[in-house]
Amino acid sequence: MQVILKEKVENLGVLGDIVNVKPGYARNFLIPFGKAVQATQANIKAFEAQKAELEKAEKARFEAAVAVADAIKDKVYTIAAQAGEGGKLFGSVGTAEVAEAVSNQSGKKVEKSQVRMPEGVIRSVGEFEFTVHVYTDVDADIKVNVVAAEA
């Protein structure tokens, strides 16, 4: 199925590209989430008329994402968690806790789905590095310091 992309989609294309995708991917993901429209002659003409304003909106989203990334990157965020002897945590610190700490301490909204934890959840105290995937092609590297909470 051919679709016209209305925004940049990772591993697929950029705004305005006409790409071939499997019908299920188009019907269940791209079209319902407003990332693409079916590539009919009428939609191609309508897209050409809207292309300038879509590019402007895409640029605004990208610039906002860069501003968020610049505000949160290269900083150390502290999370207090219950820990036992030897620095082992009772439970773990996951993406939700990291996103909440970054949002609270930086003042910028970060969703838990944007936090990338390649090593998995944190189960001990210490300093850890993560990547926050703010937007397509916009990442921010952060450090999280997990400390034992005062009883």
From Swiss-Prot:
GO biological process: translation
Keyword 4Fe-4S included in the entry's annotation: no
Pfam families: Ribosomal_L9_C (PF03948), Ribosomal_L9_N (PF01281)
Alphabetized InterPro entries for the sequence: Ribosomal_bL9 (IPR000244), Ribosomal_bL9/RNase_H1_N (IPR009027), Ribosomal_bL9_bac/chp (IPR020594), Ribosomal_bL9_C (IPR020069), Ribosomal_bL9_C_sf (IPR036791), Ribosomal_bL9_N (IPR020070), Ribosomal_bL9_N_sf (IPR036935)
GO MF terms, alphabetically ordered: rRNA binding; structural constituent of ribosome
Transmembrane residue ranges: none
Organism domain of life: Bacteria
Keyword Hydrolase found: no
GO cellular component: ribonucleoprotein complex; ribosome
Coiled-coil regions, chain positions: none
Keywords: Ribonucleoprotein, Ribosomal protein, RNA-binding, rRNA-binding
Family the entry assigns: Belongs to the bacterial ribosomal protein bL9 family.
Annotated function: Binds to the 23S rRNA.
HAMAP family: Ribosomal_bL9
Protein name: Large ribosomal subunit protein bL9
Organism: Francisella tularensis subsp. novicida (strain U112)
